[in-house]
Design a protein with these regions (language model features):
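Glycine/tyrosine- and acidic-biased, solvent-exposed loop/turn segments at the edges of beta-strands
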Residues: 16-519
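Sec-dependent N-terminal signal peptides
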Residues: 4-14
Length: 519
C-alpha cells in the first residue's frame, strides 16, 4: 500500500510539472525584472496564459510560461480572428520556426529564430534580433517580397527582393558581420524587368548603405543613364552621363559629388561647354558653344564668364577682349562686352577700343571695310564727343559728334585742300562757319551762315580775284539783299535772286551786318 501511494504521488508531481493545469489571463500577471509572477505571490508563474479583445471577446493570444518566462508555442490573433503570428520560445527568447501573417491571412514572413529577443524591427516590422537561417517575406498580395539568410541575427550572403508584380527588384550580398558586401555587385531592376542600377556599395556607420566604386545606371528604355566612380556615396572620379535618347550629357571628373576638373557638358538644347569645373560650376578656362554655332571661349568663375574672352557668333562676326558676366533669375548666365576689346565683322568692319554694358563706349577706333576710319569717343554704341573721321578719298573731319553724326564745332578738310571750320548739325554744315579754298581757288573764302550744307542766311564771299559779296544767301546762291564790290571799285547794291543781280535797292535789311563787316 505504501509503495502504491509513492507511485501515485510521483505521477501527480510529474503531471503537475510537465502538464501544469494553471491558466490565467496574461493581464493578471505581475512583471518584475522581465519575469512574470502570480498575482499576490512571490512565485514565478508557470502555466498557460490567454487574452481576448475587449470589444469582441475574440481570442487575442495563447501562450505558456515556465518559471516566469515565455516557453514553447505562442500564438497571437488579430481582432478579426485571423492569426497574426505564431512561434516558439525557449527561456523567454524566440527559438525555432516563426510565422507572421497579414490581416488578410496571407503570410508576411517566415523563418527561424535562435535566442531572439523581439528587438530591432526589420523588414515588415518583424523583429530582426536572433534570426538564424533562411527567412522569406511576402507582399500583402501574396507575391514574394524578400528572401535572405541570417546568422546570429545578422544578414549573410545573397539577398533578393521582388516588386508586388513578381518582378525582381534588388539583388545584393551581405558579409558575416551583417554589413553589405563591397566586393560583390549590387543590382536593381525597374518593375518592368529592365536593369536600373548595377554597382558596388559600402556600409557606413554600421547602417548607412552608399554606392562605392564603379556604378552604372540605365533608363527604363534600356539606354545608359550614367557610368562613374563613387566614393562613400558621392561621385568621385571619371563619370559619363547620357540623356534618355542616348545623347551624351556629361563626360568628366567629379570630386565629392560635384563636377570638378575637366569636363564636357552637352545641354538639352544642344549647347555645349568644354572646360574646367569647380564644385559643380563652370570655373576656369572653358568654351561654351550654342546650338546655332556661336561660341564663347572665356575664363569662368562660379558658373559665369568674366574677364578676357573670345566670342565668335554664328555669322562669324567675332570679338576678342574683356567681358562682364552675370547670373540670371532662372539660374542661368549672361554676358556683355565690357572693357577693352576688338570686334570684327565678316563684312570687314573692325572696332578696337572700349566697351561698356555691351556697347562701344569710351575711346575707340572703327575701321570700315571700305577703308574709312573713325578715331575718337563713343557713347552707348554711337560716335559721341570728340573724334576724327577720315575717308579713303582723303577727306577728313575733326570735331564733335553726337549720335553717330557730326554735331557741334568741327573742321572738315577735303582731299583737294578746301576746308570748312564751323558749326555742324545732323551731319551737315549748319550755323556759323568758314570755308577756304585751296589749289587754283586759293584765296577764295566764305564766312557766314549755313543751312543743311549750303550757304544760307547772311555771309560774305571773298573771291580769289579780290571781289567780294556781302549779304543774303539761299541754297548756296546770292539771294536777297546784298552788295557786290568788284575789283575795279564798282558795286551792285540791291536785290539778288538765284545768284543774279536784279535791281538796285536799299539794303537796309543787311545794313547792320554790313556795318559789322566794315568795323
Amino acid at each position: 500500500m505504501k509503495k502504491t501511494l509513492l507511485i501515485i504521488t510521483a505521477l501527480l508531481f510529474i503531471t503537475s510539472t510537465v502538464f501544469p493545469q494553471s491558466k490565467i489571463n496574461i493581464n493578471d500577471l505581475v512583471e518584475i525584472d522581465g519575469k512574470m509572477y502570480k498575482p499576490l505571490s512571490d512565485k514565478l508563474y508557470s502555466g498557460i496564459v490567454y487574452d481576448s479583445y475587449e470589444n469582441t471577446g475574440t481570442k487575442k493570444l495563447d501562450g505558456f510560461y515556465r518559471n516566469g518566462l515565455k516557453h514553447v508555442k505562442w500564438t497571437w490573433w488579430n481582432e478579426d480572428g485571423g492569426i497574426d503570428s505564431t512561434g516558439s520560445f525557449k527561456k523567454g527568447l524566440k527559438n525555432g520556426q516563426w510565422k507572421y501573417y497579414y490581416s488578410n491571412g496571407n503570410l508576411k514572413g517566415k523563418g527561424q529564430y535562435r535566442v531572439g529577443n523581439d528587438s530591432s524591427p526589420g523588414i515588415t516590422d518583424i523583429p530582426r534580433h536572433g534570426r538564424h537561417g533562411k527567412w522569406t517575406f511576402w507582399h500583402e498580395n501574396g507575391q514574394k517580397l524578400d528572401e535572405l539568410t541570417f546568422k546570429d541575427g545578422k544578414a549573410s550572403g545573397l539577398s533578393t527582393s521582388w516588386y508586388e508584380n513578381g518582378i525582381k527588384e534588388w539583388e545584393y550580398y551581405f558579409i558575416e558581420d551583417g554589413t553589405r558586401d563591397s566586393v560583390k555587385l549590387t543590382t536593381r531592376w525597374y518593375d518592368s524587368g529592365q536593369k536600373w542600377y548595377e554597382g558596388y556599395v559600402k556600409t557606413l556607420n554600421d547602417t548607412t548603405i552608399v554606392w562605392n566604386g564603379l556604378n552604372t545606371k540605365w533608363y527604363e528604355n534600356g539606354l545608359k543613364m550614367m557610368q562613374g566612380i563613387y566614393k562613400d556615396g558621392n561621385l568621385d572620379g571619371l563619370n559619363t552621363e547620357w540623356y534618355e535618347n542616348g545623347q551624351k550629357k556629361f563626360e568628366g571628373t567629379y570630386t565629392n559629388g560635384l563636377k570638378n576638373g575637366h569636363g564636357t557638358m552637352t545641354y538639352a538644347d544642344s549647347a555645349k561647354y568644354v572646360g574646367e569645373w569647380k564644385e559643380g560650376s563652370k570655373n576656369g578656362q572653358g568654351t561654351y558653344t550654342w546650338a546655332n554655332g556661336s561660341s564663347l571661349e572665356a575664363t569662368w568663375f562660379e558658373g559665369v564668364p568674366d574677364g578676357n574672352a573670345k566670342w565668335i557668333q554664328a555669322d562669324d562676326d567675332y570679338y576678342v577682349g574683356e567681358i562682364k558676366g552675370s547670373k540670371t533669375d532662372g539660374g542661368g548666365w549672361n554676358f556683355v562686352l565690357d572693357g577693352q576689346g576688338t570686334q570684327t565683322w565678316t563684312d570687314g568692319d573692325e572696332y578696337v577700343g572700349e566697351f561698356k554694358d555691351g556697347s562701344k563706349h569710351g575711346q575707340g577706333t572703327m575701321t570700315y571695310a571700305n577703308g574709312n576710319k573713325y578715331v575718337g569717343e563713343w557713347k552707348e554704341g554711337s560716335k559721341n564727343g570728340q573724334g576724327t573721321q577720315t575717308w579713303t578719298d582723303g577727306d577728313e573731319y575733326v570735331g564733335e559728334f553726337k549720335d553717330d553724326q557730326r554735331n557741334g564745332q568741327g573742321t572738315f578738310t577735303w582731299a583737294d585742300g578746301n576746308k570748312y571750320v564751323g558749326e555742324w548739325k545732323d551731319d551737315q554744315r549748319n550755323g556759323q562757319g568758314t570755308v577756304t579754298w585751296a589749289g587754283e581757288w586759293t584765296g577764295q573764302k566764305y564766312t557766314g551762315e549755313w543751312k543743311d550744307g549750303s550757304r544760307y542766311g547772311l555771309g560774305t564771299l571773298t573771291y580769289r580775284s579780290g571781289a567780294k559779296y556781302a549779304g543774303e544767301w539761299k541754297d548756296g546762291n546770292r539771294h536777297g539783299q546784298g552788295i557786290m564790290t568788284y575789283t575795279g571799285g564798282r558795286t551792285d547794291s540791291g536785290v539778288w535772286a538765284d545768284d543774279k543781280f536784279l535791281e538796285s535797292r536799299s539794303v537796309s535789311s543787311v545794313e547792320a551786318y554790313l556795318d559789322d563787316l566794315i568795323k
